[in-house]
Amino acid sequence: MQIENHKEEVPFSYYENLFRDLSPEAALQRLSSVKWDGKEFYVNLLGKTYGISHPDYAIRAVDGSKVPTLPTQTFLLRYLLEAKEVSWQGQWKTFREMPWGELYIKPYTGRVLTRAAFTFGTRVQKFKEACEKMGAIPVKHGDAGYQFDLVGGYQMQILVWEGDEEFPPNAQILYSDNFAEGFAAEDRVVAGDILISTIKSFM
């Protein structure tokens, strides 16, 4: 594959190569929510099931819709290669409260929280409608807030506050506490990105 967008394609190519050597049995031992039919893994991400061929990588949406973006595909590859299922203890954490959160908080704020604030805090009703189309669960925080099943046993909440003359719009994303052990900081950033982009696609 010719590398044109290094930022996205180099990581993808790296994990695609690792994926060839992945043992399906080992992946299934770590990830009980993933299914394997001898040819494809089946992974549910934000309510949509993807079939991922192995060992020669290919991805399809089981419902026939378009395939996800390259960063999302990289996230799914990393999930199959590295993630493990960790029990959720019922607590919610901000990005900053998890390991390495303090180190990455500045890029995370710009890439995820500020983007969410100005994408959804300026169109709260559209945000609500999009989340409800996705089957998200309303939560009683912010001017609008919803809870999502991301993948496996990992949950996310997104809360938005509408701006006014005095204050700009604001947003917060909360992660189920198992993210702290089950995902690297980089993947928590990407998870926020994926959630925002998916909600936006329903607006």
Predicted regions and their residues:
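Short Lys/Arg-enriched alpha/beta "domain-start" segment
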Residues: M1-K39, P71-T72, L80-M134
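Charge-rich alpha-helical segments
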Residues: M1-Y15, G38-E40, D56, S65, ...
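Amphipathic, interaction-prone secondary-structure segments
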Residues: A27-P55, I137-E162
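Intrinsically disordered, low-complexity regulatory segments enriched in Ser/Thr/Pro
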Residues: K48-T74, W161-E186
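Domain-length accessory/inserted modules outside core catalytic folds
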Residues: Y50, Y104-Y108, V112, A116, ...
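Short, charged/polar micro-motifs that form catalytic or ligand-binding hotspots
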Residues: V62, K66, A117, A144, ...
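Ampiphathic alpha-helical segments that act as solvent-exposed interaction surfaces
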Residues: V67-Q89, S176-M203
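Conserved binding-pocket/active-site segment within a compact domain
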Residues: G121-E181
